[in-house]
């Protein structure tokens, strides 16, 4: 008996659906993809992370020569990650940490196993110690669709302009979207940058789904808090990454607010004891304390949760960061660029009228969330606030040059104006007496 006319079409659709669970038509692939680097916080090291669709060994082959054999080997581990979407797609996330790297030396590497290898990538090992001048690309809110900053970031990376990337929350829009296929597409998109530079992150609100599981699984940050909060040293700076999202998604546990706050205070105390060696303290968190955008986001409220804490009094971060003399606070979330005057409790504390950022008496805030995503740019309120110094409603990203222990150079690159520098400022602070704002 012949099957009904619709039988074969239904069968084919079911077959395609089942194959799609692994992310591609055909047999699941053992070839590495979504390759990216991170700095594990240990001098002379670098972590390589990648994805396969079947379990394989986790190995990195590396060396100094761009062609020919790669004589050095490092092994690691993989963990299966099951996305929380309806298809329960399974990815295998591999991590290998390379150690005893020569500072400032360029390495060539590939990752994978006998079942399949990635192409060759290059990276330059971070220099050790405090006496060098790191250059970073800084941005947030970069999506798989409308990723305006990516082509220029790729060119910058190929030209060796940066030592690391700081992605200040909100990835892909969203990593979990379409049963995490959008996350896969995004990780492939950033590979030309992230496979060559340590790509350091913090979580944003768009990572929240399934308790931030895609963010925690896909990125490999230092520490033992699943990349939600951690710190690391880079040249003359101590960089602290933290989660603003613990203040908003309380159903995952109010205890996380307290845990992070206590960790932050402990880390800031240690950073201040080490201030002679690492004079700059820089923080990165997704949702800003302040902004002058024309929306109803938390940063537009006088008693914002990030600034003042839960119920306006519990675990607020502005007093904490001011107490321990944080120099520079990096934010995103608003799809625009805004630089504030040195500020504390809505009061401007410029160093002087002529040189406001020389020995400022309050932290400097930079909001850089215009790298490009499907939600487009965020407009500003018609009238700037008294504490707002520069506002740019254009796609772009920030360049941060930590020149030495006293000087930081900040520039905003406009993709709308073909790479034009639309903001340029130096922050200057003395080597001594850095903890307290006077």
Swiss-Prot record:
> Which compartments does it reside in?
Secreted
Q: Which UniProt keywords apply?
A: Glycoprotein, Hydrolase, Iron, Metal-binding, Secreted, Signal, Zinc
* Top-rank EC class of the record's enzyme: hydrolase
Query: Molecular function terms in GO for this entry?
Result: acid phosphatase activity; metal ion binding
The cross-references to InterPro entries, in alphabetical order and at most eight, read: Calcineurin-like_PHP_ApaH, Metallo-depent_PP-like, MPP_PAP, Purple_acid_Pase-like_N, Purple_acid_Pase_N, Purple_acid_PPase_C_dom
Q: Which cofactor does it need?
A: Fe cation; Zn(2+)
Q: Where does Zn(2+) bind?
A: 170, 205, 286, 333
Which sites carry carbohydrate? 211, 350, 404
Name of this protein: Acid phosphatase type 7
Name the reaction it catalyses: a phosphate monoester + H2O = an alcohol + phosphate
Similarity section: Belongs to the metallophosphoesterase superfamily. Purple acid phosphatase family.
Q: What is its EC number?
A: 3.1.3.2
Give binding positions for Fe cation: 141, 170, 173, 335
What does the note accompanying the cofactor annotation read? Answer: Binds 1 Fe cation per subunit. Binds 1 zinc ion per subunit.
Signal sequence residues: 1-26
Question: What is the source species?
Answer: Homo sapiens
Record-level GO cellular component terms: extracellular region
């Amino acid at each position: 008996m012949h099957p009904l006319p619709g039988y074969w079409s239904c069968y084919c659709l079911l077959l395609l659906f089942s194959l799609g669970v692994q992310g591609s038509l055909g047999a699941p692939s053992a070839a590495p993809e979504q390759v990216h680097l991170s700095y594990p916080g240990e001098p002379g090291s670098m972590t390589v992370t990648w994805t396969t669709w079947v379990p394989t060994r986790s190995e990195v082959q590396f060396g100094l020569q761009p062609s020919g054999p790669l004589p050095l080997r490092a092994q690691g581990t993989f963990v299966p990650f099951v996305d929380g979407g309806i298809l329960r797609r399974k990815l295998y996330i591999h991590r290998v940490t390379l150690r005893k790297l020569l500072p400032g030396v360029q390495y060539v590497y590939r990752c994978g196993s006998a079942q399949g290898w990635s192409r060759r990538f290059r990276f330059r090992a971070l220099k050790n110690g405090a006496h060098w001048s790191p250059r970073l690309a800084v941005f947030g809110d970069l999506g798989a669709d409308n990723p305006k900053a990516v082509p220029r970031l790729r060119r910058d990376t190929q030209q060796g302009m940066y030592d690391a990337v700081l992605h200040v929350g909100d990835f892909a829009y969203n990593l979990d979207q379409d049963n995490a296929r959008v996350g896969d597409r995004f990780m492939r998109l950033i590979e030309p940058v992230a496979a060559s530079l340590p790509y350091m992150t913090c979580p944003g609100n768009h990572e929240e789904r399934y308790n931030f599981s895609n963010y925690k699984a896909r990125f490999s940050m230092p520490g033992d808090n699943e990349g939600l909060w951690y710190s690391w040293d880079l040249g003359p700076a101590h960089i602290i990454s933290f989660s603003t999202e613990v203040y908003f998604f309380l159903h995952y546990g109010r205890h996380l607010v307290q845990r992070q706050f206590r960790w932050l205070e402990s880390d800031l105390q240690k950073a201040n004891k080490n201030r002679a060696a690492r004079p700059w303290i820089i923080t990165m968190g997704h949702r800003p304390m302040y902004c002058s955008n024309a929306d109803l986001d938390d940063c537009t409220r006088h008693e914002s949760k990030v600034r003042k804490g839960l119920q306006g009094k519990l675990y607020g971060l502005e007093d904490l960061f001011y107490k321990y003399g944080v120099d520079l606070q990096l934010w995103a979330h608003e799809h625009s660029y805004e630089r504030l005057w040195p500020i504390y409790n809505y009061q401007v504390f410029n160093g002087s009228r002529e040189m406001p950022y020389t020995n400022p008496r309050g932290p400097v805030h930079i909001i850089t969330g215009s790298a490009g995503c499907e939600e487009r740019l965020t407009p500003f309120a018609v009238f700037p606030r008294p504490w707002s110094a520069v506002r740019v409603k254009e796609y772009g990203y920030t360049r941060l040059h930590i020149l030495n222990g006293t000087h930081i150079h900040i520039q905003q690159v406009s993709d709308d104006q073909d790479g034009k520098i639309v903001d340029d400022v130096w922050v200057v602070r003395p080597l001594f007496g850095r903890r307290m704002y006077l």
